[in-house]
C-alpha cells in the first residue's frame, strides 16, 4: 500500500474480494467500478473511476496475488483488450480471504488447472472461437464460444477445457464443440473431476481425470 501509494484502501480491499469471488469469470475494470459505485452508493468525487480499478488490479497482479489470463481470438490471431480472466496464485489464500465461502468447485478446479499450466512454464490464454448459427427467426448469426485454456510452450500448443462433470450428452457436446472450430489439429483435452481413467472420444479429444492430469508431466 505504501509503495504503490494507494489512497483508497477500502476500494483496494473491495477489488480484492471481488476478484477472489469471481475466479474464472470474465472481468473488466468498468464492470467492477460500476458494481462498487452501485453497492456502496458512491457518486461524484467519491465515485470509483475505471482507471483506479485497473490500477489496483495491476497492483494485485504485480504482487503475485492474481494472474491475468487474456482472451485470444484463435482464428483471428489477436488479443482482446477486455474482458479478461483473473486467477488466484494461491487458492488457499483466496479461501482464507473470503472465509472459505463460495466454494464453487467448477471455478476452483479451473483455477488449479491454470496454476498447474503456469508451473509447467506454459504461456496461457483463454481461447475464443466463433460458430455460424441461426437465431430464433432463422437469420444467421455469429456465436462466440470459449476454450478455457490455450497452453503454449514453444512450438507446442494444447487446447484444454475444464469440466467438473459431463453428466449427459448435451453437456459433452457443449464442451467439445469449441474444439471443432479452431481450424487446426493441435491436441485437445478435457480435464474432468468425474472420471479416473483417461480415454479418447471419436474426435480424438483426450478425457482425463483432474488427479491424473496433475500427476502426469508428460501431457505438456
What are these regions (language model features)?
Residues 1-62, 68:
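Conserved helicase/translocase motor-coupling segment
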Residues 52-220:
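A cross-kingdom feature that marks ATP-driven nucleic-acid transaction machinery
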